[in-house]
Amino acid sequence: RTILKDVHEDFGWDFLPDLPLAKFPPYYRKGRNKDGFGVIWESSEDGEYGLPVVKPLADWSAYGTFTWPDFPVQPPQYRLYSGHMVGKDPRWYARGGWITFFETMQELRGFEDVLADIAMGEDSAFALRDDMLAFNLALVDKFLALEYDGIHFADDWGTQTSLMISPELWRSFFKPCYKAMFEKVRSAGLDVHFHSDGYIMDIIPDLIELGASVINCQSNCMGNLEVGRRFKGKVCFRTDLDRQNIMTFGKPAVVKEHIDSLFRALG
């Protein structure tokens, strides 16, 4: 608390009060709770990110009656996980959104079913993708109506050692969608932020090509030095620390050296 009086978090999160428990979204509430898409989330404790256990499009025949929600986008009053200040202010960088694409498809249809649909070239895969894109483009417009410096997109694409799908399939099926979303943001004069956990080395060149200004990734599992060798100076990295080993077991001096090494490798 003392340091926050002198050094504010760069997105201004500490200017917002914590979200009251009664206002937690469905995926952060204990028990089973339904979100605006009709996905039912299950969590064992309040504040613990839950799992989607009932997916409205697990049976594709339900798609004919599925209704896409119309979410309002308003300046946030509270913070939870990642707060987003609105408005130009020297005290913070105003970054809006946490807009997912592949992850929302999984929550609606199911992880295995989405991948199987794509692999087999099912009409359902293209229908869900195209409608998901239309939904997200409309959502981006709502964020662009507010005063932000950048818009944040997020999809976890990596496992510990590789992409979840082949880079070629990612480029043919998903890349055009990211292109459309990123172009809308960039043409409005805003920065594009993209979050993706896991090993995503294969698509970092694509994200840079598409205009991502900031990539929030886990460079440790890809090799910090190799990520820096290939991409240092081409994009801003907002990288994760080594939570699996150093941040869990390392002594203070080891942690300090780890952080310094990240700046040397990627900064």
Predicted segments with their positions:
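A contiguous, low-structure linker/loop signature
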Residues: P26-P75, G87-W92
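Intrinsic-disorder/low-complexity regions
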Residues: K5, E9, P17, R32-K34, ...
